[in-house]
């Protein structure tokens, strides 16, 4: 289910406080594109992750990381 896929991504990101590329998440979770995209969408709607699009040469890289709120 989408919830289970989102949970798998959440635990992966929560355990390793760094930015992840899409392909890294796909490989680490074993999810298909459709499952991974749905789970990322779920987490984004919940405000659990943020996206950082940075230029590297002529390619735009997509990173996913946890959002931490202190206060």
Where do the protein language model's features map onto the residues?
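Short amphipathic alpha-helical interface segments
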Residues: 1-28
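Short amphipathic alpha-helical interaction segments
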Residues: 31-42
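A short, conserved structural fragment
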Residues: 44-54
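Long, charge-dense, low-complexity tracts
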Residues: 7, 20, 45, 70-71
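Short, cationic-aromatic polyanion-contact patches
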Residues: 1-6, 54-71
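Short loop/turn and capping residues at structural boundaries
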Residues: 24, 37, 54-55
